[in-house]
Amino acid sequence: MATEAAVVSNPNTLAKYLKLDQKGSIMAEYIWIDADGETRSKSRTLKEKEYTPEDLPMWNFDGSSTGQAPGDNSDVYLKPVAVFPDPFRGSPNILVLSECWNADGTPNKYNYRHECAKLMEAHAAHEPWFGLEQEYTLLDLSNRPFGWPANGFPAPQGPYYCGVGTGKVVQRDIVDAHYKACLYSGVKISGTNAEVMPAQWEFQVGPCVGIEMGDHLWLARFLLARIAEEFGAKVSVDPKPIPGDWNGAGLHSNFSTKEMRVEGGMKHIEAAIKKLEGRHKEHIAVYGEGNEKRLTGRHETGAIDQFSYGVANRGASIRIPREYTAKGYGYFEDRRPASNADPYRITGILMETIYGSVDN
């Protein structure tokens, strides 16, 4: 049986190999999203040079092993869409975020980026800005939140949110390592904080424009999973990892357009919220699995079957920050998405509901 020591990386031993000359070659780590909303990746060797997504070769993988294709027609193709510096292997190595495509030239069933990109392009004149707040829980090898008693529970919520000190936060080293890795890679991470439930953390990405939001959030998720791997930890984006009187985990989504960000913009915010109210069920359908466990009307959430909005109200579906209500322009926050929701689906449906669908 594997021990905890056996699964934790040995960075000191690895370091001497990372310094070796690569003889004019680079390692390109191709990253994609599988059928379960998890990241997968594999590496290939390329000639050293500066790459854009268009310069990079397409690749393929066994989709029958990722839930994305049947065994008798298992090839799924990777189309590069974004390139980032690799914080694990260092320069000049790269991370290559990729879309998944079928052999017949159609987007894979789980390629939500493709439709999102079309919506962003069609409505680009509105200059949509997004900022996503990714909550997550760090688990030990027994799937217990780090720092929780093996046969009990920690003290009630209260001291943990933005907490400092032993007994209030755990695994801050993972959080800081992730922050630095995001900055190195060019991910538009804008902050981190400890969350309300012990062992729960949050990082924020944005503001990002259009399709960039989903790309940067997915890359940040990949980096977090890889870093936690080195520390022998698991990252859970379950929207309600622990039942009972504990906060769930969300992916609060902040949104604005150029019309909302200028004087008189509040009327555009209010018009958008009215449209969101009319498609509440459609949004809930793509806002993450298991969200009914989280959206209960308690623990800073609205009820899953009711749409609501309010100023500075964290128990509403949509929150308008108080300072922007006073100014009369700004942005709003959609608090409904679960922590495991796909950012392409969130940002895509926001654009579709507010500005209309696009033809295939």
From Swiss-Prot:
Recorded family membership: Belongs to the glutamine synthetase family.
GO terms for biological process, alphabetical: glutamine biosynthetic process
Biological classification of the source: Eukaryota, Fungi, Dikarya, Ascomycota, Pezizomycotina
The keyword Ligase is assigned to this record: yes
Disulphide linkage map: none
Species for this entry: Colletotrichum gloeosporioides (Anthracnose fungus)
The GS beta-grasp domain, residue ranges: 26-105
GO cellular component: cytoplasm
GO molecular function: ATP binding; glutamine synthetase activity
Name of the featured protein: Glutamine synthetase
Keywords: ATP-binding, Cytoplasm, Ligase, Nucleotide-binding
